[in-house]
Amino acid sequence: MISPGKKRPEMEKFKEIKYAHRGLHDSTRAENSLSAFAKAKEMGFGIELDVRLSKDGELVVFHDNNLTRMAGIEGKVIDFTAEELSKMSLSGTSDGVPTFRQVLDLIDGAVPLIIEIKMSGNECGVAEKLMEVIDGYTGDYVVESFNPKALKIVIKKRPDILRGILSMEYLKEEKHKGSLLYGLLQHLMLNFMVRPDFIAYEKTGYAVWGLRFVRRSFGTALITWTVKSAEEEMEAISHGFDTVIFEGYIPEK
């Protein structure tokens, strides 16, 4: 059950670079914005980003399900068109919500991408749309999701794409305590569904037995998130993670 996919040599190069969490953002560059991605590209860092659908079926780059935190607007991303989202001010900056196509045009293969597929509630079609938009892109990228269902769609449509499962210590959260499903997800026991090429695990979860077992038994590539200092980065590497998704500091390359 816990066995990941067979090691693919294509995964090795993704372990050699560090990834800016939602781009290199700060008070002047909003997270998941073209300006944050442009800065990461300029500095030679890989980029982790999130994709979900707009009202008109466009793939847009945005983390949250709703717009409250980033735009101060009531409502969900899925309730607005891509054009409407592009005109919203994110975190008080001049940045709006970009489409994924715009991001691909901007990056143009310069740095690798980690693309997280967001599926909130009953939303569907995100993975399918990603497979459509990414077709023909020649830059380096991998996809990941907390939801095995999203990765199963990737496997069905594009088994060649490197894929990873996101996980965390779910059972520490009150809402998940005692949950069999989230216990299985925490310990990577649903790996058999998607045979991931890599595991992206939260930085505090290095002692989770499922993660330790995968690391020791299969040598699967391990990425951790979200590292916020050089000290945390050193600690993560010491615990067996191959590379990091970072924010709040500029790591050495």
Please place each PLM-identified region on the residue numbering.
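Phosphate-group recognition and catalysis centered on beta-loop-alpha active-site segments
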Residues: 1-253
